[in-house]
Amino acid sequence: MSDGAFVEQEGLDGLVAEIRACRACLDAPLGPPLPHEPRPVLRVSSTARILVASQAPGTKVHLSGLPFTDASGDRLRKWLGVDKKTFYDVSRIAIAAMGFCFPGQDAKGADLPPRRECARLWHDRLFAALPEFDLILTIGRPAQAYHLKRLGLGHLLGTGLTQTVASWRQVRASRNDTRVYALPHPSWRNTGWLKKNPWFEADLLPELQADIAASLDRAERVCKGRDKSDRETATWPK
């Protein structure tokens, strides 16, 4: 790691420590307080070039402290075409949800939406401190709304999740420096959605897997010094 990258990571580590110590959803909540002790979960680094921007941890992740340690994670890794070792290599893949803590469940046992405190307090600071990403995978409506607007792509946000995901080719090609994907949550609750929208697995996933592989390969070549191109100005081929 270069001296500049070390300083960048050191500053990021301080911000992540602040986030992991956050208790705003108990001490200064926007609405009902969190029904349990906070446990913010995120994995970021100054070198990762793929961002998994998800919704919020579930019950298993709240206990493990590691994102996607559940059936949803198994399905997501299958979608991406990566194994657990690659997925959890924080030097290559960052994982940052819209809500860092498990938000609790409703009366029917479904997970509540991400807490609003996280985005308001932390997200702008966090993504300003992180490098530009090759790929941003926005999972679920809250992540899509935040990141598409942050990237100046708010006009591509559909009236609902299906419309946004169905516009994936337009969303993907909207920037030269970063490819953005809008994805449904990989929860079993969306199995019916996947059956109703077979184009997702037939058309979108092969392109997503190819982009994941290309980004990982480019990062590997840069790391080994075989690619001398400036990462700050790197663009995707048309």
Region annotations inferred by a language model:
Residues 2-219:
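A polyanion-binding, active-site-adjacent surface
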